[in-house]
Structure formats: structure tokens, C-alpha cells
Amino acid sequence: MAKNKTIEERYQKKSQIEHILLRPDTYIGSVEMHTQLLWVWNKEKNRMVQKNITYVPGLYKIFDEIIVNAADVKAREKEKSENPMTCIKIEINKENKRISVYNDGEGIPVDIHKEMNIYVPHMIFGELLTSDNYDDAEDRITGGRNGFGAKLTNIFSKEFIVQCGDSSRKKEFKMTWSDNMSKFSEPHIKNYNGKDYVKVTFKPDLNKFGMTEMDDDIESLLFKRVYDLAGTCSVRVYLNGQRLAVKDFKSYVDLYLKDNSNDNKNNKGQNDNNNNNNNNNDENANQNNDNLDVSLSNEPADGTPTKNNNNNNNNNDEDEIVKIHEKQHRWEIVVSKSDGSQFQQVSFVNSICTTKGGSHVNYIVEQLLSSLSKKANAKNKGGMEIKSGHIRNHLWVFVNCLIVNPTFDSQTKETLTTKPVKFGSKCILSDKTINNVLKSPILSNILLWAQAKAQVELKKKMKAGSSKARERIIGIPKLEDANDAGSKYSQECTLILTEGDSAKTSCLAGLSIVGRDKYGVFPLKGKLLNVRDASFKQLMDNKEIQNIFRIMGLDITDKNKDDIKGLRYGSLMIMTDQDYDGSHIKGLLINMIHKFWPSLLKHKGFLSEFVTPIVKVQKGSQEYSFFTIAEYEQWKENTNLLGWKIKYYKGLGTSTDREFKQYFSDIKNHKIMFLWTGDRDGDSIDMAFSKKRIEDRKLWLQNFILGSYVDHKEKDLSYYDFVNKELIYYSRYDTERSIPNIMDGWKPGQRKVLYGCFKRNLRNECKVAQLVGYIAEHSAYHHHGESSLQQTIINMAQTFVGSNNINFLEPCGQFGSRKEGGKDASAARYIFTKLASSTRSIFNEYDDPILKYLNEEGQKIEPQYYIPVIPTILVNGCEGIGTGYSSFIPNYNYKDIIDNIKRYINKEPLIPMVPWYKDFKGRIESNGKTGYETIGIINKIDNDTLEITELPIKKWTQDYKEFLEELLTDEKHQLILDYIDNSSHEDICFTIKMDPAKLQKAEEEGLEKVFKLKSTLTTTNMTLFDPNLKLQRYSTELDILKEFCYQRLKAYENRKSYLISKLEKEKRIISNKTKFILAIVNNELIVNKKKKKVLVEELYRKGYDPYKDINKIKKEEIFEQELLDAADNPEDNEEIIAGITVKDYDYLLSMPIFSLTLEKVEDLLTQLKEKERELEILRNITVETMWLKDIEKVEEAIEFQRNVELSNREESNKFKVARKQGPSSMKKKKKKKKLSSDEESEGGDTSDSSEFLVNTLNIKKNTNKKTTTSSNNVNNSKKRLRKADDLNSNELDNTLSVSKTFDDNNNLTDNTPLINRLNDENNEFSSNNVDNKSTNKNSRKKKPKIADSTNDNNSELNSSIQINDNVNDDINITISPNKTINVNEFSSIKNKLLELGI
């Protein structure tokens, strides 16, 4: 501060005008030249362009104040105004440095203000702090606010002229100011008969802005503001006498979007394409007057994304014009895409151009960000997180709005600061707009950017270290680095990747032979990631792949690397188990190298595999090793396995250290080099692992030929052969475990469960966790752990709606409900199961011998498929996804299926079936060609209450409850007021409260649609393995049924043939035994004091059949274990004559001595006669009759199982009712019968007759007279099961409890003879046999009794049958003390008893 200034000089007071001129930046912004990137009008291109211009913000502001005043006239205009505003005319004369702005509409009163005593135009244009915007109680949507406005333009002008026409007062006003509003003329008033208008003409004082003339930059900026008015004011706008071809905001936006994609390229140094046809396109763009539209082209918006067909541009995403428009009260929005570098916005508040945006722009953008963020991250699942800032950079938003009493950050009004709650209106973007944005290239651009960004980040993460870091690797657990890795000898080093830690240990044992200098070992944790289509997140989080890159010295940024120079290891060796999973691991590693460094695969010697035997066989000094199961199977088919010792090597861990040392000592013969033979190698790798080539993989699997395998005698293996001869076995296996077979409807895991249950004869309850161990042991299940098998068992026992129509296992415990779709099942260690009562009727045990059983590691396991009586694939449906294939088949009603089977047998047309789900109360309706819709039940109780009593199939109660909670808490679209959930684990009951108006609207739209009570059952993807194990897609359910019926009849032919040969075998054995005994009795054959060899030779010469000739019934497959057992007894298997051994006559020579009697001969002759009669019956029966008899038994068994289920449910419901009635009702318990000591030791409560029936297949009549309807149904089923043609069921008034059967000697025994397979004179085949060997000593069931006919005082007489079998084969059956049936013909009644399951 200067010391010589006086106080008066230091402290001054300025007038308002002096202050404005002295400090202009406070009022109009800077008056200095600024260079800034702005949108301006390009006269040559006739559109907006963004470029750097040099201008003075203050000059721009004084022009803006005048044109905003003109726009305010339109904003203040009332509906049906007498003087509507129609146009704004602006003249900008750069040469004369003069600007004028004219507008019509409601004018300024040409009258004297009584307080100011001057004319009103004079006051508002020539007096500071005057305005009509000071009443804050009034809601105004104008641009003016503070009372400066046009006065600032006046102050910064050399000349300022105002002209006004007042039609109501018939006067015209004109007044001129000059020299920065310091001088003014007297108002000039004259009479006027025209319409209202206001015209302001001014000459800016360019000296105040450091300018001498108006240059092109300021002109282009002012022209742009004129176009702004045309787009935001909805009036005609003229510039220098020419009307602007902009009619509305949409056409205004076109001035930015058209060809600006090319401008963005220009900014990056690329060429620009001109397009001067905007005016015509603007006219077209206004043809659609809808409030909401979306366009991706220059064509009229029709809501459908289209490509820009401009011939000057390529039709690619970069050239697409996105224009998504929505118009609401006081708001108009257009959403487009930016170039991704930064967020762009063009916005207006009350016609003011807010160049920096503000709260109104954020208000709109935040709505877009919320939806885009959710969708983008969902589509980019597994990739890098896409944040709101990233998404914002891809948006270009145009906003034109009217805000009540807006506030800005400064007088320059570049940024709106009004809070959204004070906007005076709301603009919630519609769902249609949001959806159109999500479908537009905006989202795809965001995802592309995210992927590009991810690649950059990934390269940083995966980039190999420095050369020094490559010499020694530290910090990688379990790596056994080669001593020479990273050194000058690194090209000679090999990294061995092993499948697991145990394989690594075995490998190290082998390395003790060849040394550690040139070999490193790194164990893989399991299967590598499929990097072909892996996400960013997957790659970034996969430490194992990163470690492999580091160990090898591979750099992900060097995709063209084609040699091994610079690597820490010159080659890579894969050491995995020789099974399907091992092949998959090899494929994944090959896929990884091919994805990142395809050229390395062409380098011979870079990639190899170490192979170990999967099977070894030895016989004496002979030893063979097999490297694939297929190779072993081929050898086995052409070899007599007698005497061979066979050892299976499940994994690398099976080999001993000694064997691994042996392998490495001969490493050349255990090493196969992968070889690149051409482009087909790369194509086959891509086909096997690319998600985009699903159809190619389908064709690949369809052309699969069983028996083609890699020849391990060859030391080179092409990648093409690896994929097509080894990897395909894994893909085939993956599909087999996911897609069921048409014959039994089972996947391998389910088939193993059924096989284990049948083998264990699971009649009594068994804990699921224990059953899993048994099944794994007896079916060679070792692929996916116990948890997977446990879930399979649980699924097979589930009974809730949407699960099984027929459950083949009993759910003894909590096996899940429709509450959570079975996910609420208890742990396997808490629940029990057993075979359901209908299972053995459907999977008839007499089909077991004709099935083709699989063999794994010499162990007989489950069959290729079972052959049920009815097609269970249609009964319970299926769902699965495998390699290249998926399948879905809905459930169907077993009654409809059986009816169609009968039509098939009778050669009648089949009737199409509609899907059916047990206990489902809703509707199932066809939706056309794709399938069916399942529809729940919703009823209107009153005008504000709804009740939902059924949900669609596969829509679970808990999920639906969460859906209702969303409807309740959704602030934007709250549909319901409240809901009450009274659903149980079985039944659905939701009571919903709604606003009556919303309920009525929902009814109009459709309650089932609004409340999502529909689900789809597709019938277009019925893919199954056919009987020949080929994948087949079936068009309809009837195609499946026809295929099944054809194969089922063939199976009955096989069953019949088997039983005939079985009877013939037994007949031949009886005949040989009879001949043998008679020979000994008649001294025709002397067996004592003879060697076995001599005796066998004599038997053969005398025509006795060796057992191997009799045993033609035995299946062709001879299981290896039998041969191994035979190898342990060489004496018995020594060939005596013509291939005959001692064992071939054991069936004769091992007969007990007391059998060598004439009585036995008579007995055998009787048996022989019976066998001949049985054979005659069997040969005469047709396979169709056999099937119909089986179907009858199946129907009865299913009905019985269903009635038991309903009875149990009814009992449960009784408990629920009793609980509601109070404690007193619960005290009424049925008095239990006092148990005997024997019964107590067996846990002998026998009150649950239905459970007793299910477990033992014995029949017991319910004597409780107060039986409910469901109980009667159960009893009716029991009666049907025990009914015999010649026994009146009314005579069976007492309990019938029988567990014994007759053997061929007419003795009561536990052994079931073949005749038990023939139910009646028509040779009906039974499906309800009882295997009494399964009776458990720890069973809690009461032992059934056979009454002693000699005990007249038997206390159990009223609860049992007395059977008296005399020497004349007469059988007396005592039903009650006074009722006895005598039957002379043994075989007839015997068959009748057997029909009862005895």
C-alpha cells in the first residue's frame, strides 16, 4: 500500500454501475480472453462441434441475459393466452458489432410506474435491482432472478436500445442508452395498433472485453446459444433472417449426435466425414410425437434399435447413434453414448445453458447409474468391478427442464445448485427408458471397456519378473525347482506338473533315478481353470495359473512367443491319472498354452505327457501293461482270463516307489510328445473348450465311436488325436452323468443308488450316511464324493409337489419340502431311507438277469440301464446339463402313461399327454409349440384382499415369500400393503392386502401375471441317451414312449428266453442227478476208492453233462473275480479231458450221501415232471400278456404306496387338529395291547399295519371299526393284493400273516423256487416276492406265525392260517375254528398262495 495516499484515496465508495464496471467478474464473469473446449455452431457442417475456442465469458454472458429474457416470456405464458409467443428473432452483425433480439408474446406494459414515476420499460432495462422475480412465494420457472439481467448488458454496451409494443394500451415505447448506461434519451412514445413485442438492440463495448471486433469463435458460440433457444423454447427461432430447422428438443439433440462419432475420431487425429443433410433428418425426427422413444439411427424413432445406414460409414458399433428419449411434465431427457473417455452432458434450466451441469443432471444420471451398474456387473460377473464412475464416462445426457425458483453457483449460472426436493416436479425415468438404455450399445461399450481395462490389469499381474527374478523362484509353496532352472541350461530343463501332492511324492521317488538338476516338480491342486472364456476376476484370483507362469518364466504380454529362449524351463510335462479326469486336466493345460501362447504348441518337444499303466496283468513270467481302459477291454475280449492276475491302478498313488523308479529308468517309453500337425489341431482345442462352440461339441459327441483310443505304442500324439481319441471320453462321461437314459430315466449316480439298494435288499430303514458307504463300495462310486451321492439319495426319496410323482425310496425323516425345493432336508447322518413299496414292482427283479452289467476294476457293478415296467423317465421327468447338451422332460401321470402302453400293446393310436405333478392343485396349459405353463391359484376375497393357495411348479414357498417382501418394500412400485403367510411345508396359503385401486389395476393386467404365478415347462429339449447309448433328441413324449415300448417288449422276449433256459438247466440237472443216483444204487457206477480225475473221465464217457455245458443260461460276461478265485484252486481247475475240470461235476459229486436213495429218485422224478409242466406254461404265454400282468401289479403297488402316503398325511393332520383343540384332546390315546416277552425283545409294537405291510409285504387286516376314508383306501389296496380266484375275500375275516414259502419238496422253507415266478395257471409273473433272508434279527417288527395244526387251543388261532400238509399232498387251510378249506390239487392252491406273496 502506497504511503503517500490519503485516507479519502484509500477508502472509497463507488456507485452500483461503477462497481459493476470495476469488478465485472462478480456479475458477468471474466472479461479476459479464455481458451476452452466448448460446443459451438459450425456453419459449414451445419451442426454442433466441440472444439477449443478463445472467447471472453463476460461478452457471452451479456448476450445470454437478453436471450434468456426472451425465453422467459414463453415460460410465463399462461394456457390460452391472448398474446401467445410464436417466435424469437435474433440478428448478430459481426461487421457492425450490433446484436438485436426480438420476441412477441406478452409484452412489457408501456405505462408509468407510480412509485418510480418512470415508464416500466425504462425501469426494468435502465434501473439496477429492478425485476418482477422478487416474490419468493410465487413459483416461477423463468431464468431471471436477481434484478441484474439486461441491465448488465446495458452497462457493458456502447449503445442499448429498447423497443416495446403494448397492444392493450395501444402504445409503442422506444428508448436509447449509451456510454455504459451513463446516458439515456427521453422515452419516445407513439400510438401503436400491432401485437405485443419486445426488441432489444445493443452494441457491446468491446473495449471493456479487450476486443476490437467480434471474431469467428465468439460468433460460433453465440450462434450455438440461438440454436439452444430453438431446441428448448418450443417457438420458431430466426437467426439473421433465416428460420432455424429445429422444432423441438429431439431434433436439437440431433445437431450433436449426427456425425459426431467421426468428430471424436478427428480429435484423435482421424479424418472426418461430412453430412449436411441434418435439416431433412430433423423434419423426419419429429414425425413421432410419443413421449417415449428410442432410436439408434438417423431414422424416426420407433423403439427398435437399428443400425445407422449412412453410406459414408461402416455399419459397426462405433457408428451407431443412440438416442433414447423421454418426455415428462417439465422434463425432457435424451440419453446417448459418449466415447468412453469422459462423461458428457448438455443441459438447460429454464432455457439457461448450464454448461457445467448441476443437481438436475445428477438427478437423472444417478437413476441410470443404478440400473447400469447392476446390469453391467451382472454381465461382467467374475470380471473387474465396474464402478459408477466408470459407467458415467460412457454416458452422454441431454436434459431440458423447468425448475421452480432455481438457484445457481454464481451469476454466470453455469451450475444448478437447487436440491431435487425443491425442483417443483419429479422425473422418474420409466422402465421402458431404463430397459432401452440397458439394451443399447451403452452397456456393451461399458463391458468392452471393462474387458480392455481388465486385460491391462491382467498383464500387470501376470507379467514375468526380471531376469534376475527368473534365476531363482521363491515364495511358491510345494514347488520343487530344478537346480538348473533359470540358468544357461534352462532350455534343457523340464517342469513336471502332477495331479495332486501324492503324485508329486511318487514323482520325486522316480527323480532319484534321473536326478534333480534338469527336472522340477509342481503339484496341481485339481483341475485348472478353463482360461478360454475365463473372466478377469477368475484369472486375477487364480494363484495356481500365476504360479505356473512364474515358474516357467512365461509372459502373458508376449502372445507371439514361438521359442523357448528366455524361459526358466525348456519343456513342460504333464503327469496325471490315466482316467477321464486326468485327460481333462491335460486338456485344460493344453488349452491354457494355446490361449496365451499358441505358437509354443508348434514347438516340438515343448509339451509332453508322462503315462503310467492303468491296468497290469500277470500270468507266470508274462506281464502286460495297459494305459487305457479301452485298450485293456480289447485285450480282455480276446483272452481267456483263467490264471491271469489283474491289478488296477486307480491313480498315480497306486504305483509304488519301486515302480516309479522303474518308470523313470525307462522314461522314454513312458513319455509321449504332443505334436502340432496343422490348423486342425488348434481348431479342435478351441472346439473342446470354447463356450461359443456348443453346437460343434454336440456334433463332436454325436460322432463319437466307442473303441477308438490313443495308441500308447506311438511316441508322438497330435493335439487333434488327443482331443478326438482321449479327451472325448471325458466329455462323453460328463454328458452321461448329466443326461439320463431313456430306458430307466436314471443318471449313473441314481442307477448306482438303486443297484446298491437292490443288492442290500433294503427293506428295513437304513441311515442315509451309512447307505452311501455301502453304495460306494458295491458300485465303485469314487468320482464326486459322498455329499453328491447323499443328495442323490435324498432327491430319489422326495415327495413334495414338483419333485417325484413316484418316489423310489422312502423318506424316513426330513427329506426336504416345497418350502425351499428340498434344500431344507436334514443332514444325511440324521435321516433314514429304504426301498419304497412300489419300487420292486416297477423295477421287476425277474429282469435283473437279462440286464447288461458294467464292470469296473474287475467288480460287477450296476447295469448299463434298468428296464422298468413303465417308463420312469416320463413319470418323474429329468433335468440336466452336460458337455454340449442339456435336457428337460416334465413329469407325466403314470395312469396316462399306462393307458398309452395298453394302446401300444393293442396297436391303437396313442393319445398325447399333458404334464402332471402329484398334488399340484393349479392348472397346466399349453403355451403353443414350446411347451406348457403351470399356473398357480389366486382368488379375490374382497376389494382389497387376495388369497394365493398354489404356486407354479418349481417356484418354492420361501422364494415366493421373498418376492412378496420386495413388492411390499419397493418404494418406487409398492404394489401390496401387507401379507400373511399361513403356508405349511405341504400347502400354500398367502393372504395379501392391497389398495383397492391397485388391485383393480392388477386384475385388468391379470393377477397371475402381476404376481408371477406362471412357470414354463419346455418340451423342446427332450434329449436322452437311447438304448444304444447314443444321444438322441425326441420331439414329443410319445416318441419317448414308443421307443421305450419297443425296447420293453424286446426285454420281455429276453426274460422269457432266460426263464425257459433257466428251467431247462434245472431240468437237465435233475435228469443228471436222477441218472447218477440210479447208477450208484444199481451198482452201475462205483465212486469209492477212485481218484477225482478217473471219476470225472468216467462220468464224461458215460454221457453225464458237465456243468459248463448245462450252464448256458449264464451270461456271456464272465466276471474277473470268479476267474481270480479259480486261479487260487489250480487242482480243481486242471483240465482232465476235452476242457473238462473237476468242478464241472461238483453238482453230482458233492451230493450228500443220504440223497443216494430210491426215495430221492422218486422226488426228483416228481420235480422233473413239474419242470416240464412249467416249461409248457412258459412257452405258451405271450410277452404282451406278461407285460399286462406286470402293469396290473405296478398299478396296485403304486396305489397302495399312495394310499399309505395319504394315510400318514391324514394322521399328521389329525395331530395338528388335536394340538389346536388343546392338551385334553391329546390325552385320548389308544390302549396298547400287552406284549409277550418275545414281542418285547423284538420291539413288538405292531399297531402300524401299513408300515408293516410296506416292510414285509405280509398282509394284515385292520380290525379297527372306526377307520377313516384314507384308512379304508389302504385296506382296499391290501385286499386287492391278497385276493385269490378260488378264495372269497369275505372268508378272510381274521389276520392273514404268512412269511414262509414252499420249496420243490413241498417243505416250508425260506428258499424261493422258480415256480414262485409263475403266479397262476396263465403264468402270471409275480413282482411281489419276499426275500426272507433279509429279515433282520434286530427288526422291530412282530414275527408272523404259522399256526400248528395240532394245537387246538392255539391262542393265535384268530390271527393266523393253519396249514396241514399230509402225505397225499392234500392241504387243509383253517381260516377260523369252524371254517376249513380242503384242496386236493397241490399245485393249484400252491400257486394261489404264491400269488399272495407267500
Swiss-Prot record:
EC number(s) stated in the UniProt entry for this protein: 5.6.2.2
Lineage: Eukaryota, Sar, Alveolata, Apicomplexa, Aconoidasida
SMART domains: TOP2c, TOP4c
Binding sites annotated in the UniProt record for ATP: 69, 103, 131-133, 144-151, 411-413
Cofactor or coenzyme needed: Mg(2+); Mn(2+); Ca(2+)
Site (Transition state stabilizer): 829
Domain Topo IIA-type catalytic: 739-1191
Pfam short name (any one): HATPase_c
Main location as per UniProt: nucleus
Site keyed Interaction with DNA: positions: 527, 530, 697-698, 747, 781, 788, 956
GO terms, molecular function: ATP binding; DNA binding; DNA topoisomerase type II (double strand cut, ATP-hydrolyzing) activity; metal ion binding
Site (Important for DNA bending) residue list: 881
Compositionally biased residues, Low complexity: 267-291, 1262-1276
Disordered as annotated region, ranges: 260-317, 1214-1250, 1262-1361
Gene: TOP2
Cofactor stoichiometry and binding remark: Binds two Mg(2+) per subunit. The magnesium ions form salt bridges with both the protein and the DNA. Can also accept other divalent metal cations, such as Mn(2+) or Ca(2+).
Any one of the GO CC terms: nucleus
Subcellular location field: Nucleus
Ranges of residues in domain Toprim: 493-608
Positions that bind Mg(2+) 1: 499, 577
Protein name: DNA topoisomerase 2
Family statement drawn from the similarity comment of this UniProt entry: Belongs to the type II topoisomerase family.
Active site: 830 (o-(5'-phospho-dna)-tyrosine intermediate)
Classification via Gene3D superfamilies: 3.30.1360.40, 3.30.1490.30, 3.30.230.10, 3.40.50.670, Histidine kinase-like ATPase, C-terminal domain, Topoisomerase II, domain 5, Topoisomerase, domain 3
Xref: PANTHER family: DNA TOPOISOMERASE 2, DNA TOPOISOMERASE/GYRASE
Record's miscellaneous remark: Eukaryotic topoisomerase I and II can relax both negative and positive supercoils, whereas prokaryotic enzymes relax only negative supercoils.
Reactions this protein catalyses: ATP-dependent breakage, passage and rejoining of double-stranded DNA
InterPro entries registered for this protein in UniProt: DNA_Topoisomerase_II, HATPase_C_sf, Ribosomal_Su5_D2-typ_SF, Ribsml_uS5_D2-typ_fold_subgr, Topo_IIA, Topo_IIA-like_dom_sf, Topo_IIA_A/C_ab, Topo_IIA_A_a_sf
